[in-house]
Amino acid sequence: MLPLLRCVPRVLGSAVPSLRAAAPASPFRQLLTPGPRLCARPFGLLSVRAGSERRPGLLRPRGPCACGCGCGLLHTEGDKAFVDFLNDEIKEERKIQKHKTLPKMSGGWELELNGTEAKLMRKVAGEKITVTFNINNSIPPTFDGEEEPTQGQKVEEQEPELTSTPNFVVEVIKNDDGKKALVLDCHYPEDEVGQEDEAESDIFSIREVSFQSSGESEWKDTNYTLNTDSLDWALYDHLMDFLADRGVDNTFADELVELSTALEHQEYISFLEDLKSFVKSQ
């Protein structure tokens, strides 16, 4: 069974997008940040009325601390239970971890990591191709209740495997014109990921195309951006062939999902370890 901490908050997080404030986003870098989340506990629990009996160890330790170790810091029985839970969670996540090291991409791609952002780079016949993606918010939400488990059937067999399908940006720079980059913003349509019925079907799509200055760290919204929703299909097919000729095809997209999923799981385990260290720190 997938650990409770990993699946439940992500499901709850997907249920409150309407509460998030709308903010302008770059048309290419779909590297989203998490929105605000609702507090699951009433604020009344965080205060104590005058004259009421104080719950030991809820907010303040009695004396130097609740456990009597004399450190003078707040750490309650709830913190201890939290740390024990995180220990079990980390063990379970390591048990189901498929890749102890990140899988390599075929085709001579070089990987460069910067936290949750990853860059894949290669050079082909005088051209530099860079693919950038971010694992944050890259796991599609899962919803319960689609199918009830039959009698005697284990629940964990019906829980879907978490797969990271990040948006990614392809940047192509030609050496004879190194100041200009062709930028293609791509994503994985939800109805295409994991489908193997149609061998010729593309598992990723191009959403937007533009030219940007290769020396700029941030791309400009003032540059003309071509949205593929209203694009002639012949032109769209040529753009997809353009990417395939440079190694960005279905095979690449499959391997990118595998790499991103392994990286996301690795970062998730690191987050749990940091959270455990923070809660138990004195």
From Swiss-Prot:
Q: Where is this region: Interaction with MAVS?
A: 168-213
The UniProt annotation puts the region (Disordered) at: 137-163
Which segments does the entry list as coiled coil? none
**Annotated membrane topology:** Peripheral membrane protein
Phosphotyrosine, modified sites: Y188
* GO MF term set: adrenergic receptor binding; complement component C1q complex binding; enzyme inhibitor activity; hyaluronic acid binding; kininogen binding; mitochondrial ribosome binding; mRNA binding; transcription corepressor activity
- InterPro entries from the xrefs? MAM33 (IPR003428), MAM33_sf (IPR036561)
Signal peptide limits: none
The compartments listed are: Mitochondrion matrix; Nucleus; Cell membrane; Secreted
Q: Which domain of life is it from?
A: Eukaryota
SUPFAM superfamilies this protein is in? Mitochondrial glycoprotein MAM33-like
Phosphoserine occurs at which residues? S201, S205
Q: What is its main location?
A: mitochondrion
Q: Define the transit peptide region by residue numbers.
A: 1-70
Q: Enumerate the UniProt keywords alphabetically.
A: Acetylation, Adaptive immunity, Apoptosis, Cell membrane, Complement pathway, Cytoplasm, DNA damage, Host-virus interaction, Immunity, Innate immunity, Membrane, Mitochondrion, mRNA processing, mRNA splicing, Nucleus, Phosphoprotein, Ribosome biogenesis, Secreted, Transcription, Transcription regulation, Transit peptide
Q: Which residues carry this modification: N6-acetyllysine?
A: K91
An example of a Gene Ontology cellular component annotation for this protein is: cell surface
What ranges does the record give for the region C1q binding, renumbered to this chain? 76-93
GO biological process annotations for this chain's record? apoptotic process; complement activation, classical pathway; cytosolic ribosome assembly; DNA damage response; innate immune response; mRNA processing; negative regulation of defense response to virus; negative regulation of double-strand break repair via homologous recombination
Q: What does this protein do?
A: Multifunctional and multicompartmental protein involved in inflammation and infection processes, ribosome biogenesis, protein synthesis in mitochondria, regulation of apoptosis, transcriptional regulation and pre-mRNA splicing. At the cell surface is thought to act as an endothelial receptor for plasma proteins of the complement and kallikrein-kinin cascades. Putative receptor for C1q; specifically binds to the globular 'heads' of C1q thus inhibiting C1; may perform the receptor function through a complex with C1qR/CD93.
Fill in the subunit field for this protein.
Homotrimer; three monomers form a donut-shaped structure with an unusually asymmetric charge distribution on the surface. Interacts with CDK13, HRK, VTN, NFYB, ADRA1B, FOXC1, DDX21, DDX50, NCL, SRSF1 and SRSF9. Interacts with CD93; the association may represent a cell surface C1q receptor. Interacts with KRT1; the association represents a cell surface kininogen receptor. Interacts with CD209; the interaction is indicative for a C1q:C1QBP:CD209 signaling complex. Interacts with FBL and RRP1; the respective interactions with C1QBP are competitive. Probably associates with the mitoribosome.
Protein family according to the UniProt entry? Belongs to the MAM33 family.
Query: What is the protein name stated in its UniProt record?
Result: Complement component 1 Q subcomponent-binding protein, mitochondrial
Per the UniProt entry, what species is this protein from, by scientific name? Chlorocebus aethiops (Green monkey)
